[in-house]
Amino acid sequence: MTAPLLRRLTAGLLILPLLFGAGCSDDKTEKPSLTLSAEKIVLPSEAGATARLDVTASGPWQLEISGSGFDASPLHGGRGTTSVTLTATETNPSTARTSLGSLHLFMPQSGPELTVSVEQRPAVAAQTLLLYMPGRSLASYFEQNIEGIRRAVDADTPGDGRIFVCWQPANQRTAELFELYYDPNSASCATREVKTYTEFNAGDPESVHTLFAELADEAPALSYGLIIGCHGKAWVPASAGTLARGALQPSDGAKEYWQPAPGAYPTRSFGDSGYEMDITELADALAALPYRFDFLLFDDCFMANIETLYDLRASVDHVIASPCEIMADGFPYDRIIPQMWTLDDLGAVCYEFWNLYQNDYASTIYRMQSGCITLAVMSEIDRLADVMRRINRTPAAEYDPNTLQTYEGLSPHLFYDMGQYVSVRCSDAALLDEFAECFDAAFPPESRLHTDGFYSAYNNRMNPITHYSGITISEPSTKFTEENRATNWYRATHE
């Protein structure tokens, strides 16, 4: 091959890759992009409140404001992520969320255009919820409950509602009140310290009434909800439960009666002696408030009890409670908090409690498949008392108390299944039908849920459930009989 021909072939080979590469090269021209951290911004109710919007762009962008009642800064930015701060210039004094306007963001060089709506929460909350957790013996579990609420709080929960917590982290003589809320700037749950009560006694009705009254001043709302998480013994007077306030010794062997079995798992029944409040005192404290709680959730043992609920019927509209002991874990707050903002969802709260202990109990601390729950409609309690009064006027049928379903491991038993008790005590079919109708109205069947058994610290074992109406009664018991006959329920149904 001659040298000129070789040079021509070599040149051709060098040119071919260059042409091939030019034909297959990628178009590296970047497409304009504009993304936002939110499609809607909701400002707090007060003037001066702020929220943040993150703008991420591939190049220069601008912002235009439409509406009034808020400002935004900066109004433009460049490549990368820029934080825009929105500031409310006025307070929204209404009871409803207000639409303030919108932000229009665009890229001048024919890029994307996006719109963000801007709203402001009302000064009067849709609902104020208080989680009241007095006492120290369950403090570590209370901390877990509070963390559960933090996990539940997001941009949608509690929405236009507000959540407050009062507990006693330091000692039994002081209390801390704080608010948990969604902070749009950090996109997470934040805490606002409200007040330290330097002198607080959870067993003093005046202290408790003051706390509840000041809550409405701090967070006025269209409706109110209350969760009480502590130890519970239903209607049993403090003097017959553990140590009465001011007493040196428990009465009538009460301390031994309420003694948990050796090695028992903790439940929300025993502890915090000397700081108990009678249910009648709680009812009076609630009734004296300038507002009424729409619901009261007892994260306590034994509170789904007719003697107890009768005392509360004029103080609250709905009650969620358990007829037996609640494991120390308590309610699954990360699951129930999103359900607590409309009365229609109270049944869902019951379901979430039951579902935890029925299906997810392995995730709880003590892994006990023990969870019973009931929803009470308090406006129906008087009607139930009326039919019970007429039942008690009829001759009592003979029955064996030992065959009745009980809900604790105490000896002698104290809490009996009310539905089963009435069915064996009354032989009048018409009255039984009327009782069943009133009972279902007061305690909707779909919200009376139970596991196959319940755990009791008083005998340190699981106990089977063969009858479940969801409500207990203490009348068949031989313990605290004089105290029981002094209850408002007994007097109202035994004329």
Annotate each predicted stretch with a short phrase.
Residues M1-A22:
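Sec-dependent bacterial lipoprotein signal peptides
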Residues S33-L36, T56-S83:
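Surface-exposed binding patches on compact interaction domains or structured appendages
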Residues V84, S94-Q109:
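A short beta-strand micro-motif common to beta-rich folds, especially ectodomain repeats
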Residues P122-A221:
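N-terminal extension/subdomain marker
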Residues Q168-E193, I227-S273:
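Surface-exposed loop and adjacent secondary-structure segments within mature catalytic domains
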Residues P250-E495:
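Terminal, contiguous helix-loop blocks that mediate binding/assembly
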